Amino acid sequence: MKEVFVDRKWNEAVMTQHLPLEGIRVLDLSRIIAGPNCTMQLADLGAEVIKIEIPGSGDDSRRMKPPEVGGEGHFYLAFNRNKKSVAVDMKSPAGLDLIMRLAATCDVFVENFRPGVAKRLGVDYETLHAKFPRLVYCSVSAYGQEGMMSDRPGLDPVFQAEMGLMSLCGEADGGPIRPPLSIIDLFTSLYASTAVCAAIADQKTTGQGRHIDVSLMGGAISVLGNAAQYYFTCGEPPPRVGNGFPTVVPVGAFAGSDGGLFYLACGTQKLYENLVIKALDRPDLAEDPRFAGMGGRVEHRTVFMSILEEIFAAEPRDHWVEKLRTAGVPCGAVRNLDEA
């Protein structure tokens, strides 16, 4: 086995520390993002992760390029640090035997096959639990292991569309927009790693493993959070407000006199008063009945945001960022990845 990618700076930072999952061994049969990010979190916490890949081609994410480093796609590098990799033909008797011998030495088993595939390969939960009852077995799939939709294929962008996340993003007068990140994959993977850690703790007490069933659909529903509760509360979906926030004003991006953008967020009345009184020297905006309370500012969002836009257009971005921070207002320059 060889290390396929190691974050050297991370290793240097933690090499003198005791990590909470040291001594835990994970057999990782997952690929792309959700499963690999789950096991990468476990590796970062000290677990030894053995990644199983297809002979000749490996994880599909190796080929997701450009860009690439040393022939490896950026997707693969993003979600597979601190792991050991071995190529195994699981469809062969020898390959299956190797998987079983590895599983016998592991505490955790993670897979993200479509439901039914693990059983056909002979590495499903029931089979492994019968052989290794202490093994924590985590399945990551699109719609879960059971139910009328369990056999459907699914990827992050589809769930962003299907579960309503896209409908929340975009300008009020435009259509839905997909956030350009694999948000559902990432959230689902964190739920999976959290569940695995909880199951490991239970394993230490009971001596038994368990089957963890994590789905992208469940992750997508959870991501909706307060947006879902907004709908349950009033029966209407939250409006699209571009870079703003449906129930909090002011939140958004503003341009300074130099065209530079900065972002501020006043989530409490105290922060709002810091903005208009301390930073802008406009106590009248704190006293105006239209803007004095959060409900009024939400109702009069367009008028209020226009007032702020006019004020901020008088000075360059950096002037405002410094002044807002001095006043205790959460803010920051809008940067691209080069600048960040």
Roles of regions detected by a PLM:
Residues D89, E111, V214-M217, L264-C266:
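Active-site-adjacent beta-strand anchor residues
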